[in-house]
């Protein structure tokens, strides 16, 4: 036992690791609150499972989309903290992007150097950092087809609202690869306990709503391949950012987690405060590939630096061609271009038609609407970037 829970002197007293008790987590999980689920196909090991077809029918109208988003947000906040969408991406798109990721991995291996991993032994598995930008530069048309996905956008809007920022990191757990230790994710999931204790209590509650974690299965993932382990409802534990470091909590997670097999093209989204860890791949011949999505609120900042102007310039011809063919590429624009107007230089970049100046995404959408050339878009983006510089 780590220590006794002591009542805080005020509602804003700092949380302390010494006050973390497994008993408190166990009691919370024994009496979970569960939202009313209207659109699920099934519930598996406490986790709502939505079918892509069911969701697409439900979000065909603005009212329907808002209703679904409200349900997904409640699942993430007050429910189990996680949901699965089966068949979220088409296999053809997945296979093309998987091939691109394999090429990137091969190229980066040839360059040498160690690739770190936050929660697993470095070098055991394969990682692609900033996979979003690397995919856009190497395979712009595949990027557009992948990130034009309406269900990735649905999950992102449900938790974060509009203007979200997408980053991605590819994780390949090789045969025999050992899984991760239990953790929470960005932001406070990436600070030491000593630093985490310095953040006020309300920031512990704020951190999870700044980010949505997701993963796209790029291959079939039966349990023996080590799909991610989760502890449903653990995102509600107030001391969780301090607790997951503690041995007793790690042991509790090992004994009580759930593990959902996934099929290629399935997507899982979860609250970043949910206790979770990638599993061990006990197979001898399956390289388990997942594209890990980290979607950030426009009110926060993403973990990775991403050259979004470079991405947009690279994929713009593909955006034009897909638009001309009648495809909706707005979600791909949202995943690539900066969708938030601030910070900016308000002496130069002043609001014209509203409370804020146009965003980079606005520039791209306007260019697409006009059928502007790549060169014209480049000039507009340069002017826009110059206005935003102090």
Predicted stretch roles:
Residues 91-93, 174-176, 222-224, 237-238, ...:
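Flexible loop/turn segments at secondary-structure boundaries
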């Amino acid at each position: 036992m780590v220590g006794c829970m002591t009542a805080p002197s005020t509602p804003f007293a700092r949380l302390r690791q010494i006050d973390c008790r497994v008993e408190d987590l166990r009691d919370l999980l024994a009496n979970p609150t569960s939202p009313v689920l209207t659109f699920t196909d099934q519930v598996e090991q406490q986790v709502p499972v939505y079918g892509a077809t069911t969701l697409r029918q439900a979000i065909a109208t603005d009212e329907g989309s808002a209703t679904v988003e409200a349900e997904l947000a409640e699942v993430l906040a007050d429910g189990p903290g996680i949901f699965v969408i089966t068949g979220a991406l088409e296999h053809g798109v997945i296979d093309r992007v998987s091939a691109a990721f394999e090429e990137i991995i091969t190229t980066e291996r040839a360059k040498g150097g160690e690739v770190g991993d936050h929660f697993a032994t470095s070098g055991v598995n394969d990682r692609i950092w900033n996979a979003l930008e690397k995919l856009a530069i190497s395979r712009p048309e595949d990027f557009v087809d992948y990130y034009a996905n309406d269900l990735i956008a649905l999950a992102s809007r449900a938790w974060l609202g509009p203007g979200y920022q997408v980053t991605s990191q590819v994780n390949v757990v090789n045969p025999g690869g050992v899984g991760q230790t239990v953790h929470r994710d960005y932001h406070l999931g990436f600070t030491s306990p000593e630093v985490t204790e310095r953040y006020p209590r309300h920031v512990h509650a704020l951190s999870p709503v700044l980010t949505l974690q997701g993963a796209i299965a790029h291959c079939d993932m039966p349990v023996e391949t080590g799909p991610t382990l989760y502890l449903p409802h653990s995102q509600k534990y107030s001391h969780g950012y301090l607790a997951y470091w503690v041995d007793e909590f790690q042991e509790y997670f090992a004994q009580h987690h759930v593990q959902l097999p996934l099929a290629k093209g399935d997507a899982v989204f979860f609250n970043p405060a949910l206790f979770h860890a990638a599993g061990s791949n006990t197979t001898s011949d399956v390289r388990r590939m997942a594209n890990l999505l980290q979607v950030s609120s426009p009110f926060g900042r993403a973990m990775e630096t991403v050259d979004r102007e470079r991405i947009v310039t690279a994929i713009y011809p593909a955006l034009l061609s897909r638009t001309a063919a009648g495809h909706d590429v707005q979600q791909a624009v949202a995943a690539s271009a900066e969708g938030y107007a601030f910070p900016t230089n308000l002496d130069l970049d002043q609001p014209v038609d509203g409370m804020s100046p146009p965003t980079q995404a606005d520039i791209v959408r306007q260019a697409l609407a006009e059928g502007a050339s790549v060169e014209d878009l480049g000039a507009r983006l340069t002017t826009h970037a110059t206005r935003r510089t102090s």
